[in-house]
Each structure stands twice: as structure tokens, then as C-alpha cells.
Amino acid sequence: MAGVRLVFTKAFMVTVLLTLLLNIGVKPAEGQFSACSFSSRPHPRGICGSDLADLRAFICSRRNQPAMVKRDAETGWLLPETMVKRNAQTDLDDPLRNIKLSSESALTYLTKRQRTTNLVCECCYNVCTVDVFYEYCY
């Protein structure tokens, strides 16, 4: 038996590697992103269903609210010293005011994260943080 030599073809090796990848799965490094598939199940500490929608709405509504400002106790109106006044002269002196771009050119400056996952994948099938919810606020 010392003289037995195993010979594997490329097709056999590719089949073995694909089988291993499909059965074991490729997991991302911790903290990079969450991977989900059709066989994913909710994490024991994940937030799912209407709880997920409610929490997203709450976090996004709190994020978009302005900072606390002083209000008149009797009327509830903002006090004048907390209001921001625009200065017409500084608005005219703005160096970016005369820059004109086509819509197509202007859109190239906007960056948006390419999503490979969604909120359910990140927060129901995995455990997520508040920062993940912020990424889904519009």
C-alpha cells in the first residue's frame, strides 16, 4: 500500500470545495456585515416583526428631532434668543453660490452605501446596534 498514489482531477476538487462552501457557509469577519440566506432563522436576541418596525420608527424619529431649546413656559413658543437669524450679506458672499452642475454631474457627488443586506437580516437574524438603525433612517 506504500505505492498507492491518489490522483484528483480539477473537476473533483472544484466539486469538493463548492460542497464545503455551501454546507459550511462563508461567514464574514465579526463586525463587518451580516450575512443571511433563505435558511436563516431569527437570532435569540434579534428584534423581529412589528417590534423591529416600531423600534426603527422610534430611533429615526428621535434622531431627526432638533436639540432641546428654550421655550416660553406659558406659551410654548421658542424664545427669540434661540432662533437662528439668516444674514443676507453672508448668503450673497457664499463662494459655492455660483457653482452650477447638471443633475447627472451633481448626483455623482452623492454617495450611498450599497446594501447587500437589509434591516431584517441585520437586526432579526443577527444582533445589531443603534448605529445600524441609523443607516436605515431616511
UniProtKB/Swiss-Prot annotation:
Q: Which residues form the signal peptide?
A: 1-31
Tissue specificity is: Expressed in the cerebral light-green cells which are giant neuroendocrines cells involved in the control of growth.
Q: Which residues carry this modification: Pyrrolidone carboxylic acid?
A: 32, 114
PROSITE patterns on file: INSULIN (PS00262)
Q: List the disulfide bonds.
A: 48-124, 60-137, 123-128
Q: Name one GO cellular component term.
A: extracellular region
Q: Which residues form the propeptide?
A: 72-84, 87-111
Record's Pfam families? Insulin (PF00049)
Q: What domain of life does the UniProt record list for this protein's source?
A: Eukaryota
Q: Give its localization.
A: Cytoplasmic vesicle, Secretory vesicle
Molecular function (GO) terms for this protein are: hormone activity
Subunit-structure text: Heterodimer of a B chain and an A chain linked by two disulfide bonds.
What name appears for this protein in its UniProt entry? Molluscan insulin-related peptide 5
- The organism is Lymnaea stagnalis (Great pond snail)
